[in-house]
Design a protein with these regions (language model features):
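Membrane-interfacial hairpin junctions
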Residues: 1-8
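Transmembrane alpha-helices and immediately adjacent membrane-cytoplasm interface residues
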Residues: 10-37
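Intrinsically disordered or highly flexible coil/loop and linker segments, enriched in small
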Residues: 20, 52, 68-72, 177, ...
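Membrane-spanning helices that line or support transport/gating and their immediate boundary helices
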Residues: 22, 26-30, 150, 212, ...
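Membrane-proximal, non-transmembrane interface segments of integral membrane proteins
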Residues: 27-119, 124
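Small-residue-enriched, tightly packed secondary-structure blocks
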Residues: 98-214
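Acidic, carboxylate-rich catalytic segments that either coordinate divalent cations
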Residues: 198-251
Length: 251
């Protein structure tokens, strides 16, 4: 049947078009993530060698990455006005860090706090162990994707898995995998921990793990390395995200 043949050919062409669009999207996502990696490594090299010319190239690439984004326009304008006055690589990169990435860091931190609170709540309230594992995994993957988007690394499906693998590798490399009472007690207090139910305690531990994953994701996705002492404190994030839950539970 001629018409049936045309219909099959049209469906096949449509299928190929969809596949092509997906491939283009994934390649674009990989390219975007790779661009952030290159800027981050170039910034580390410029700082290590105190190379002002290399630092200016980093700033040019960084402003290009965020060109067209309304949430960075004010920072880009301030950076443009002041960068000519900087004659030191570390000072120039610190200026870009403050003006461009400061608001993005705050947004990323809010994402981590929200995800940690959500995971802790779901673990505490859902009695099925497998269900809370699935919920925690989904929350962590969404959090990593959102953090990547905040810093300009739009990730597709394959890009998300690559990013997740990079975050987990970073966690292992920095030894920030485990968390338990020794981490929570200085933050929430030993007397409070002793009053919590087992399930609620598990929720706090899972929330704390999510916070650590979030901080690792920020370090991986951020186009500039953190200056010494500027890295987000996992403990402060845990305290902000989970202390309200503990207060509610302990009443």
């Amino acid at each position: 049947n001629l018409y049936l043949g045309y219909a099959v050919a049209a469906l096949f062409a449509l299928f190929l078009l969809v596949v092509l669009l997906i491939v283009i999207k994934e390649l674009s996502a990989f390219a975007r993530l790779g661009r952030i990696d290159r800027i981050q490594h170039a910034a580390e090299t410029a700082l290590a060698s105190a190379d002002l010319t290399a630092a200016r190239t980093v700033i040019k690439d960084l402003t290009g990455l965020y060109a067209g984004r309304d949430d960075t326009k004010w920072g880009r304008d301030r950076l443009k006005d002041r960068e000519a006055d900087m004659f030191d690589a570390s000072a120039l990169i610190a200026l870009a860090d403050h003006e461009l990435l400061g608001p993005l860091d705050a947004a990323a931190r809010r994402e981590v706090e929200a995800a940690a609170r959500q995971v802790a709540t779901v673990t505490a309230l859902v009695p099925l162990a497998l269900a809370d594992v699935v919920a925690a995994l989904g929350s962590n993957i969404r959090m990593i994707r959102r953090i990547a988007e905040i810093y300009g690394g739009r990730s597709g499906t394959l890009g998300s898995w690559r990013l997740t693998r990079a975050v987990l590798s970073h966690l292992v490399a920095t030894g920030a995998v485990a968390v338990g009472d020794d981490m929570l007690e200085p933050i929430l207090g030993g007397s409070i921990l002793g009053k919590l139910s087992r399930r609620f305690g598990e929720g706090l531990v899972n929330g704390a793990l999510t916070a650590r994953v979030g901080v690792a994701a920020i370090e991986v996705c951020r186009p500039l390395p953190f200056a010494p002492g500027k890295r987000p404190s996992v403990r402060s994030i845990i305290k902000t995200a989970l202390s309200g839950l503990v207060t509610t539970k302990s009443r």
